[in-house]
Amino acid sequence: ACFIRNCPKGGKRNVDEGPTKPCMFCSFGQCVAPHTCCGEKGCEMGTVDANMCQEENESPIPCHVFGKRCLLNHPGNSHGNCVTYGICCSHDTCTVHLACM
């Protein structure tokens, strides 16, 4: 996964073809979106700590989120990662997901 502004020239589909780095860490886990921090205890969205994740947008190298892949039923964005027990997130949404349990 990559954040919105730091995707490679060809878009998100080209992330696997170029260099990536792990997304930055936040207060209790990993940044999974510009305003979302997830870890073992769940996810925070829009908090002061989670908003620090928007710094990832300044990096020219796309980042990848740890966790196995999961599919979301979300128009235009069906690929996500299991970011904590039972939660699948993409760059713009998180949802409860059985594949992440």
Curated annotation (Swiss-Prot):
PROSITE patterns reported for this sequence: NEUROHYPOPHYS_HORM
Tissue specificity remark: Expressed by the venom gland.
Keywords of the record: Amidation, Cleavage on pair of basic residues, Disulfide bond, G-protein coupled receptor impairing toxin, Secreted, Signal, Toxin
Propeptide cleavage-removed residue intervals: 11-18
InterPro entries: Neurhyp_horm (IPR000981), Neurhyp_horm_dom_sf (IPR036387), Neurohypophysial_hormone_CS (IPR022423)
GO MF annotation list: neurohypophyseal hormone activity; toxin activity
Coiled coil: none
Residue numbers bearing the Glycine amide modification: G10
Cellular compartment(s): Secreted
Domain of life, per lineage: Eukaryota
GO cellular component: extracellular space; secretory granule
Disulfide bonds: C2-C7, C23-C63, C26-C37, C31-C53, C38-C43, C70-C88, C82-C100, C89-C94
Leader sequence residues: 1
UniProt miscellaneous comment: The letter 'K' in the name 'Conopressin-K' proposed by Kumar and colleagues stands for the eighth residue, which differs between conopressins.
Family: Belongs to the vasopressin/oxytocin family.
Free-text domain note: The cysteine framework of the conopressin is C-C.
Classification via PANTHER family: ISOTOCIN, NEUROPHYSIN
Full protein name: Conopressin/conophysin, isoform 3
Organism: Conus monile (Necklace cone)
